[in-house]
UniProtKB/Swiss-Prot annotation:
Statement: the UniProt record of this protein carries the keyword rRNA-binding: yes
Organism from which the protein derives: Marinobacter nauticus (strain ATCC 700491 / DSM 11845 / VT8)
Entry keyword set: Ribonucleoprotein, Ribosomal protein, RNA-binding, rRNA-binding, tRNA-binding
Protein name listed in UniProt: Small ribosomal subunit protein uS7
CDD domains in alphabetical order: uS7_Bacteria
InterPro entries reported for this sequence: Ribosomal_uS7, Ribosomal_uS7_bac/org-type, Ribosomal_uS7_dom, Ribosomal_uS7_dom_sf
Described purpose of this protein according to its UniProt entry: One of the primary rRNA binding proteins, it binds directly to 16S rRNA where it nucleates assembly of the head domain of the 30S subunit. Is located at the subunit interface close to the decoding center, probably blocks exit of the E-site tRNA.
Gene Ontology BP, a term: translation
One GO CC annotation: small ribosomal subunit
Subunit comment: Part of the 30S ribosomal subunit. Contacts proteins S9 and S11.
One Pfam family in the UniProt entry: Ribosomal_S7
Family under the similarity heading: Belongs to the universal ribosomal protein uS7 family.
Length: 156
């Protein structure tokens, strides 16, 4: 814990095309080596593909995909008397968002399509439909928390 002031949260500037702060944050997650224009091209390209394949608003599909990936509970390791227990804890909203974005990018990169925009679009469409690797990751995390429910009395 810091002894001085806690650093103020910096406000994220919404993205220029859709005016969404959440999408701007996601673009930052996609970005590698500070190449923001490349990341923007990838994300906007993916959203164009999403709009093409599904006849819905791409930003709504993106939001729906993130909602389906966000974990409600996760496990944290806690040492008690020489034994390490996986203790289920609720995930705060900002971390839910961060994990969902991280998993969406991670599992998009592992897909087989040619371009990153196509991979990302595929993962967004799958996640919006409650399928795909990112949603499976969320289910695995929830299953882990459910299996370790007995240790939930070891609070943090």
């Amino acid at each position: 814990m810091p002894r001085r002031r806690v650093a103020a949260k910096r406000e994220i500037i919404p993205d220029p095309k859709f005016g969404s702060a959440r999408l701007a944050k996601f673009i930052n997650h996609v970005m590698e080596s500070g190449k923001k224009s490349v990341a923007e091209r990838i994300v906007y390209g993916a959203l164009d593909i999403v709009a093409e394949k599904s006849k819905e608003e791409p930003i709504e599909m993106f939001e729906k995909a993130l909602e389906n990936i966000q974990p409600m509970v996760e496990v944290k390791s806690r040492r008690v008397g020489g034994a390490t227990y996986q203790v289920p804890v609720e995930v705060r909203p900002s971390r839910q968002n961060a994990l969902a974005m991280r998993w969406l990018v991670e599992y998009s990169r592992k897909r087989g399509e040619k371009s990153m925009a196509q991979r990302l679009a595929g993962e967004i469409l799958d996640a919006a439909d409650s399928k795909g690797a990112a949603v499976k990751k969320r289910e695995d995390v929830h299953r882990m928390a459910e299996a370790n429910k007995a240790f939930s009395h070891f609070r943090f």
